[in-house]
């Protein structure tokens, strides 16, 4: 019976491959970065357009669809149970494209078996895969015990207000998985702490300081405009100098990456901060602020701020500074930390305030606790067993620093579609980075995994 099912799924995937890629390209072509709220578009015109198009694609597959007051939507297959339902949830909003692209970020390209474009991995490719999982079940005429909803989020990258709205106005699923991380199964996510380091109005040497495109990404570019003579400045690695007006524009060139996985990145804001300090391009108030910010950038483990810690399930705390800006004469540096169970948001805030002293003010603090679900629960076992059978691996669940929709639901995990051992091609980049890339064969394999997992979840007594 299992072999016959495998053959049916393989035939379905092969027959639909080209259309799957076309549908992903359609969603990628929509710039769905969060924008200013509009009438009927609480998260901006781009996310609303992506939501509408996704529901249109689902309807074209014969799935029932619903737009939940423009905050979120879903495609659905009916089931016998009128009270309980299963769900998947993906998102069709994306982070800003940022710098460094060699391709148009909103025109999907295919090269050597890889898709390239903003959202191919996070999370438009997986969104399309979940729709096709429901399409398979519909075409096969499977009688479902529990209805299945493929939820379509459009505010994941910033605030997740979409899922907050949904859970406040609609019943929660008995189990939900989100294809927005790595395989096999992530059954725990670190806590999330964010805030801003704000300077006083310094009226000093630094006239402008900008860097980064998202608070959740390590910036690869940053620059400061300072009132000085370029002939007095020295060269430094990853720093360029150019005259601008009556001063000098100092640019830092780093390497971008996701805030939850900062290993191997180079923060361009930190490069500029160090250059300003090393060359005394600041007055006393600016120096005090930059010294505070330097403590943030000195270590992605939080050593400089005195917040470093680690535990067994989650490993070490991470922290990055994603964006720098000048607002009303004040420098503003954002922070994004993913923390394990050995600390909490209040403790982190207290430790940071101690570390920065009077040089900066910590503002706009927010935090969310870690969450963890035991790996031996029936739904998680169904997911992990399916993954191992399809791939031939003997993988076990893991925890991570990334934050997904899963933490918002009573019983949920993230489930693929990426792989921790995936090696990006020279022309490809990571989620949130330039030239975001995803392998076609692995996404199609994920589609097979999702179909079988949903069938197994249907058999569980929730």
What is each PLM-predicted segment?
Residues 157, 164-341:
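Midchain, well-structured core segments that form catalytic/ion-binding scaffolds
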């Amino acid at each position: 019976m299992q072999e016959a099912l495998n053959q049916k799924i393989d035939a379905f995937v092969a027959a639909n491959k080209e259309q799957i890629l076309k549908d992903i390209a359609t969603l990628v072509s929509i710039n769905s970065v969060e924008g200013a709220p509009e009438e009927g578009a609480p998260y901006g015109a781009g996310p609303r357009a992506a939501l509408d198009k996704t529901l249109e694609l689902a309807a074209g597959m014969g799935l029932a669809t619903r737009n939940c007051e423009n905050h979120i939507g879903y495609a659905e297959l009916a089931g016998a149970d009128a009270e309980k339902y299963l769900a998947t949830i993906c998102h069709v909003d994306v982070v800003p494209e940022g710098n460094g692209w060699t391709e148009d970020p909103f025109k999907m390209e295919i090269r050597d078996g890889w898709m390239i474009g903003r959202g191919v991995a996070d999370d438009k490719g997986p969104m399309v895969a979940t729709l096709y999982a429901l399409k398979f079940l519909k075409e096969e005429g499977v009688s479902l015990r529990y209805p299945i909803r493929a939820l379509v989020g459009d505010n994941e990258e910033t605030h997740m207000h979409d899922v907050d709205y949904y859970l406040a106005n609609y019943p929660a699923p008995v189990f939900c998985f989100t294809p927005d991380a790595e395989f096999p199964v992530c059954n725990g996510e670190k806590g999330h702490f964010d805030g801003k380091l704000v300077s006083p109005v310094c009226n000093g040497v630094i006239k402008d300081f900008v860097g980064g495109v998202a608070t959740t990404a390590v910036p690869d570019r940053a620059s400061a405009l300072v009132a000085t003579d370029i002939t007095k400045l020295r060269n430094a690695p990853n720093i360029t100098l150019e005259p601008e007006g009556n001063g000098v524009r100092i640019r830092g060139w780093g390497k971008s990456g996701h805030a939850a996985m900062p290993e191997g990145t180079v923060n361009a804001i930190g490069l500029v901060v160090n250059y300003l300090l090393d060359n005394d391009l600041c007055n006393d108030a600016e120096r005090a602020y930059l010294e505070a910010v330097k403590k943030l950038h000195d270590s992605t483990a939080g050593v400089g701020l005195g917040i470093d810690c680690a535990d067994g399930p989650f490993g070490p705390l991470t922290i990055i500074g994603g964006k720098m800006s000048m607002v009303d004469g004040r420098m503003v540096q954002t922070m994004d930390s993913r923390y394990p169970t050995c600390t909490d948001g209040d403790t982190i805030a207290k430790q940071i305030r101690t570390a920065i002293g009077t040089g900066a003010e910590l503002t706009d603090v927010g935090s969310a606790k870690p969450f963890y679900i035991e790996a031996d629960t029936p739904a998680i076992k169904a997911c992990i067993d399916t993954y191992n059978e399809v791939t031939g691996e003997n993988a076990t669940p893991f925890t991570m620093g990334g934050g997904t929709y899963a933490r918002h639901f009573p019983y949920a995990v993230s489930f693929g579609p990426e792989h921790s051992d995936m090696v990006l091609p020279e022309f490809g980049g990571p989620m949130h980075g330039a030239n975001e890339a995803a392998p076609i064969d692995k996404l199609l394999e994920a589609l097979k995994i999702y179909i079988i997992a949903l069938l197994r979840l249907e058999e569980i007594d929730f």
